[in-house]
A protein has these predicted regions:
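Short, structured helix-loop element that forms part of the nucleotide-activated donor/catalytic region
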Residues: 225-238
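Catalytic binding pocket for nucleotide-activated donors in carbohydrate/polymer assembly enzymes
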Residues: 274-324
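Conserved catalytic-core segment of nucleotide-activated headgroup transferases in glycan assembly
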Residues: 190-222, 226-227
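Short internal beta-strands
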Residues: 138-139, 218-224, 287-290
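Donor nucleotide-activated moiety binding/catalytic core segment of transferases
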Residues: 235-274
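Active-site and donor-binding regions of nucleotide-sugar-utilizing enzymes
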Residues: 17-18, 22-151
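A nucleotide-sugar donor-handling region in carbohydrate enzymes
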Residues: 131-197, 314-326, 330
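Leloir-type glycosyltransferase catalytic cores
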Residues: 303-364
Length: 364
């Protein structure tokens, strides 16, 4: 496979992100990679000489019948991949491997074996197999998985890089000049647990109509899972009440981050841990909009966000309150950094003997 995003030399450890191609899984991998590459953490692990760093996640697409088996019992998992994808599993192996999704788990375990344990392996989301196969297992608290090497997160590990925030803020600076209160409305869609039915759309549209009449500026965005008929419906609604609407490139540059930055509140449908976590990362008052269906796992997610003060159920009214932003990707990145430093201790600084010299935190 042509390593288009492969850098042979870089400052610090080499990191590979891996996903199974699902957008939500890839987003969590990118979030942890971005958090790990923040300036403060990068300086603490800059002494680790890595090779073969990849800036963007690798997509592994195993085929049947392997994909029909439990994640912990795939015989010869490399045989499930294409020739190009199999070619990735050869030296030099990365210092850190960060993967998400059940179908990536057999390859996380395999890279650990092939590297002789040198690669620090991080698996995100419940792989439905033993946590002992990974150096770190990162799972949502609502999945109810525990262990010595398990990090439980509230929601998903979201992260927005400072430079991305700055450039987005500048590109959409006109939003800062708008008068009155604004609300981002994030629409999900059908999933195993929830369905975006016509009845749910009726209820939400009526509630948004009332908010528009109260002079709330609405910014509505759809996701990849939003049914086409729901997209069409809320696009027409936005035109009718003067709201903004975005569902893809045909609507112009993606304003998702800008709307998170420049909104006073958020309405998020209940079906997506990632979307709820994005709003919580920004500290927005989250109003969870109900769809049809439920699951014990999502019930626990909603309760954890509500108990932390991040969210409330949406009843048609918008409130504003404050809470510490939810920065779970940073917590995961800190755990990765600590394990890296334990494996690769920072070198002593020659010539620094004066105990009165106070070093920056990242040099201590």
């Amino acid at each position: 496979m042509a390593p288009a995003s492969l850098a042979d030399e870089q400052l610090g450890p080499s990191v590979w992100g891996v996903s199974d191609g699902r957008a939500g899984n890839a987003a969590q991998v990118r979030a942890v990679m971005r958090a790990l590459s923040s300036t403060g953490r990068r300086m603490q692990i800059a002494h680790i000489a890595g090779a073969g760093h990849r800036e963007t996640p690798i997509v592994l697409t195993p085929r049947a019948p392997w994909t029909l088996l439990p994640g912990g019992s795939w015989p010869m998992p490399l045989a499930a991949l294409s020739k190009d994808q199999r070619s990735l599993f050869q030296p030099p192996f990365p210092d850190v491997w960060i993967a998400a999704g059940r179908r990536s788990a057999p390859y996380t375990a395999r890279i650990r074996e092939l590297s002789g344990g040198r690669t620090l392996t991080v698996q995100i989301l419940d792989p439905k197999t033993s946590a002992d196969k990974f150096d770190l297992l990162v799972v949502p608290q609502h999945d109810d998985v525990s262990g010595a090497n398990v990090i439980q997160t509230v929601g998903s590990p979201s992260h927005f890089a400072a430079d991305h925030i700055e450039t987005t803020g500048q590109a959409f600076a006109d939003l800062a000049d708008e008068q009155g209160k604004s609300c981002i409305v994030i629409l999900g869609g059908d999933s195993k647990a929830h369905r975006f039915t016509a009845a749910a759309a009726d209820r939400l549209e009526a509630q948004l109509t009332a908010l528009a009449q109260q002079k709330w500026r609405l910014r509505i965005t759809a996701s990849r899972r939003t049914p086409v008929e729901i997209i069409a419906r809320f696009r027409a609604f936005a035109d009718k009440v003067g709201a903004r609407f975005w569902s893809g490139p045909q609507d112009g540059p993606n304003p998702y981050l800008a709307w998170l930055l420049y909104s006073d509140a958020a309405i998020v449908t209940e079906d997506s841990a990632n979307m709820l976590s994005d709003a919580a990362w920004h500290g927005l008052p989250i109003h969870i909009a109900r769809l049809e269906g439920s699951s014990p796992k999502f019930d626990r997610l909603h309760e954890s966000l509500i108990s932390r003060g991040c969210a409330r159920w949406f009843d048609g009214t918008l409130s504003q309150w404050q809470y510490p932003p939810l920065r779970e990707a940073d917590r995961v990145a800190d755990a990765i950094m600590e394990k890296l430093i334990a494996r690769h201790p920072q070198p002593a600084l020659k010539g620094v003997k004066d105990q009165s010299v106070v070093l920056p935190d990242w040099l201590e």
